Each structure stands twice: as structure tokens, then as C-alpha cells.
């Protein structure tokens, strides 16, 4: 993500905050945080929708929005990789926000995270190209 063009002034500091929250205490703390976040998501619904469904719908969006573009550049794998990587990044950002808020995450916060990520990725042809060729 640090190879992307930063479109908003605070995007890099947002990435740094997420990185510190998730990985700052080491690998074992990261695994414990992810375990607790998974348990939280298994019990919690966000505006009536489970986290699995949210992530699935985001994957459908990324595939639907970009897969057909492979007709022009023959980069089918890149389009799918970008979809998978985007879901992974968003999940990590959700976990970081949840941890920063002492185990709380709302549907509105999920929306904000997805919106900000989408703005950084999709409003730059350079960023789309980088994500499709990682």
C-alpha cells in the first residue's frame, strides 16, 4: 500500500496507525487480536449483515467492476488478485479500527473505511495499475 499514490493528506498516517495497531506488538499479539476479532465478527451483525456477507459483497463488487477490463489488457489474474488483496486489506483495516475502539465496530465505520480505501484505490489509474501488478 505504501507504493500507491496517496490522494488524501492523511492516508499515509491512517496506514501507519493501522500498521501500528495490528503489528506493533509482534506476531503473537497480532494473532491474538485477529482471533478475538473473528470471535467478535462471528457474534456481531452490522446493520443486520454478517461480516462474511460484507466481505463477500465487497469481493463481488471488485470482481464485477474490474474483471471485464481484462478484455483490454489480458490481465485476468491481476484483476482477481486486486479483488482478493483489497478484501484482505479492508479486513485488516476493520480489525485495526475494532482494536482501536476497544472491541467495537459499527456498520457506519465499516462504510467509512471502505469509502476511504475505494477513494485511494479507484480514483487513481496509477494505484489501480500497481494493485493489479503486485
Predicted regions and their residues:
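Hydrophobic, aromatic-lined core segments that form the binding pocket/scaffold
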Residues: 1-134
